[in-house]
Amino acid sequence: MAGALVRKAADYVRSKDFRDYLMSTHFWGPVANWGLPIAAINDMKKSPEIISGRMTFALCCYSLTFMRFAYKVQPRNWLLFACHVTNEVAQLIQGGRLINYEMSKRPSA
C-alpha cells in the first residue's frame, strides 16, 4: 500500500501538470510571500520595543485580504492561503506582544 502511494506521488512529480504548477505564479507567488511570516516568526525572539504597531496592523489587514483572495481565486491557491494564515497568526502574536509591552511601561495607579 505504501509502495503504491509512493509510486503515485513520484508519477505525479514527473508529470507535466506538476511541472506546469512549478512554473506558475500559483507556486512562486506564495514561495516569495513566505518571507513575511518567516520574518515575523523570527522577530518573536527580539525585544518588543522594535515592533511597529502601524506595520503590524497593516500586515494583519493585508493577510486577511489576501487570505480571502487565495480562497476565492479559481483554482484555489492553498499554498498562498496557508502563507497568509501563518502571517496573520504571527502578526497577531506580535501585536499582542506590543500591547503587553506598552501596558507594562505605564505606571500603575
UniProtKB/Swiss-Prot annotation:
<protein>
    <recommendedName>
        <fullName>Mitochondrial pyruvate carrier 1</fullName>
    </recommendedName>
</protein>
<dbReference type="GO" id="GO:0005739">
    <property type="term" value="C:mitochondrion"/>
</dbReference>
<feature type="modified residue" description="N-acetylalanine">
    <location>
        <position position="2"/>
    </location>
</feature>
<feature type="modified residue" description="N6-acetyllysine">
    <location>
        <position position="72"/>
    </location>
</feature>
<keyword id="KW-0812">Transmembrane</keyword>
<dbReference type="InterPro" id="IPR005336">
    <property type="entry name" value="MPC"/>
</dbReference>
<dbReference type="GO" id="GO:0006850">
    <property type="term" value="P:mitochondrial pyruvate transmembrane transport"/>
</dbReference>
<keyword id="KW-0813">Transport</keyword>
<comment type="subunit">
    <text>Homodimer. Forms heterodimer with MPC2. The heterodimer is the more stable and dominant form.</text>
</comment>
<dbReference type="GO" id="GO:0005743">
    <property type="term" value="C:mitochondrial inner membrane"/>
</dbReference>
<feature type="transmembrane region" description="Helical">
    <location>
        <begin position="21"/>
        <end position="41"/>
    </location>
</feature>
<keyword id="KW-0999">Mitochondrion inner membrane</keyword>
<comment type="similarity">
    <text>Belongs to the mitochondrial pyruvate carrier (MPC) (TC 2.A.105) family.</text>
</comment>
<feature type="transmembrane region" description="Helical">
    <location>
        <begin position="53"/>
        <end position="71"/>
    </location>
</feature>
<dbReference type="GO" id="GO:0050833">
    <property type="term" value="F:pyruvate transmembrane transporter activity"/>
</dbReference>
<keyword id="KW-0472">Membrane</keyword>
<keyword id="KW-1133">Transmembrane helix</keyword>
<dbReference type="Pfam" id="PF03650">
    <property type="entry name" value="MPC"/>
</dbReference>
<keyword id="KW-0007">Acetylation</keyword>
<dbReference type="GO" id="GO:1990830">
    <property type="term" value="P:cellular response to leukemia inhibitory factor"/>
</dbReference>
<comment type="function">
    <text>Mediates the uptake of pyruvate into mitochondria.</text>
</comment>
<feature type="topological domain" description="Mitochondrial matrix">
    <location>
        <begin position="2"/>
        <end position="20"/>
    </location>
</feature>
<dbReference type="GO" id="GO:0006086">
    <property type="term" value="P:pyruvate decarboxylation to acetyl-CoA"/>
</dbReference>
<feature type="topological domain" description="Mitochondrial matrix">
    <location>
        <begin position="72"/>
        <end position="109"/>
    </location>
</feature>
<feature type="topological domain" description="Mitochondrial intermembrane">
    <location>
        <begin position="42"/>
        <end position="52"/>
    </location>
</feature>
<keyword id="KW-0496">Mitochondrion</keyword>
